[in-house]
Design a protein with these regions (language model features):
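A short glycine/serine-rich beta->alpha loop
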Residues: 180
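N-terminal accessory/pre-domain segments preceding catalytic cores
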Residues: 19-151, 198, 225-229, 249-345
Length: 345
């Protein structure tokens, strides 16, 4: 009996250790984790001068190390050079704390959290301490709310802090937007995404490069709620999600897109894959769409692989490029877009 009991205890401890080991990983997919480490090593090899990666010498648990590895593997080079490692480690720890303390944290899929909560950068803004500042201010405000209602409440908070005013092309940081109390749509959406991510809510900035019905462009926010992405106007609170002044224009839009740091393997159509980010097409969230396939041939009728194909929308008295593609070995490329007119060049 004693031997049997000891054997059962050892088996239980072994299983518990295995579970803890899996739970300790920030990236549980071994193949993806290996890819992240390989990409990080490649960056380190190309940036040997200085101590840009010295933060990895600090004590970290497995979860923190893997999260930091993901950030450093795919963040812009300027961020690695301009901001210290302690800054990114503090952001990582705050993000993991939010996932632990917020009631919805345990229900957010690993991939969604990795790509739409962990990253600090939203656009081309200066990075700041907003993740830590916003978390301290917002965690009590969303306490006891569902994920759906928390998104609405955070947007109300954003409206209290920032209102719309046109500005220049330089995107202000989230804390700078609070200090000025205004921002254009790209700044309001950057600010709102930062606020949502601070309390562990997956969020992304959405752009239509050019409207189909009028000149100019627009930016807003999508938040992930219980398995689905919902849109809303940044700093423009409404009583429900999927409602904004731009509902009708967006339903006629030709293209909506967002950029996702890292090698993203979601369900959305990939428009462009770079070493650092994945640009995805999310037009299907807004209206009726159709997929067009283009075949590139030379004057002799032969297919042309690796040809650059531009999809353009007429706006501001010009044909503006909203998507760049490359033809495959068959000379073909495709794009899903709203139903309307485009020039393919």
């Amino acid at each position: 009996m004693n031997r049997k009991l000891i054997f059962m205890l050892l088996t239980f401890l072994w299983l518990m250790m295995g579970c803890q080991s899996r739970e300790g990983h920030f990236i549980t997919d071994e193949v993806y984790r290996s890819q992240v480490y390989a990409d990080l090593q490649e960056r380190e090899s190309s940036l040997e001068q200085g101590d840009l990666f010295s933060v990895f010498n600090q004590p970290m648990n497995m979860e923190e190390k893997e999260a930091m590895s993901f950030l450093y593997a795919y963040m812009p080079l300027g961020d690695i050079a301009d901001y210290g490692g302690d800054y990114f480690l503090e952001n990582v720890r705050t993000s993991l704390l939010a996932r632990k303390e917020m009631p919805w944290g345990k229900n957010i899929p690993e991939m969604v959290f990795r790509h739409f909560v962990l990253p600090i950068r939203v656009n081309n803004e200066n990075l700041d301490e907003s993740r830590m500042v916003f978390y301290k201010e917002l965690k009590e405000r969303v306490k006891g709310l569902s994920l759906h209602d928390a998104v609405l409440e955070v947007n109300h908070w954003c409206h209290e802090k920032v209102i719309y005013t046109p500005s220049d092309a330089r995107t202000s940081s989230p804390l700078a937007s609070i200090k000025t109390a205004y921002g254009r749509c790209g700044e309001e959406s950057t600010f709102t995404v930062a606020a949502l991510r601070s309390v562990g809510i997956p969020a992304r900035q959405v752009y239509t490069p050019r409207w189909a019905h009028t000149d100019d462009n627009h930016a807003w926010v999508e938040a992930w709620v219980d398995g689905k992405w919902y849109f809303f106007g940044a700093c423009e609170p409404e009583p429900v999600l999927n409602l904004g002044w731009f509902n009708a224009p967006a339903s006629r839009g030709m293209l909506m897109h967002t950029k996702v740091f890292g090698k993203y393997n979601g369900t959305e159509e990939v428009m462009m894959q770079t070493p650092l980010y994945t640009e995805i097409n999310i037009i299907d969230n807004y209206g009726e769409t159709a997929k067009v396939t283009v075949t590139v041939k030379d004057k002799e009728g032969k297919v042309v692989p690796d040809a650059r194909v531009e999809f353009k929308v007429y706006n501001y008295a010009e044909f503006y490029t909203v998507a760049n593609k490359k033809s495959d070995e068959k000379g073909q490329t495709s794009l899903t877009a709203g139903k309307g007119d485009m020039l393919v060049w």
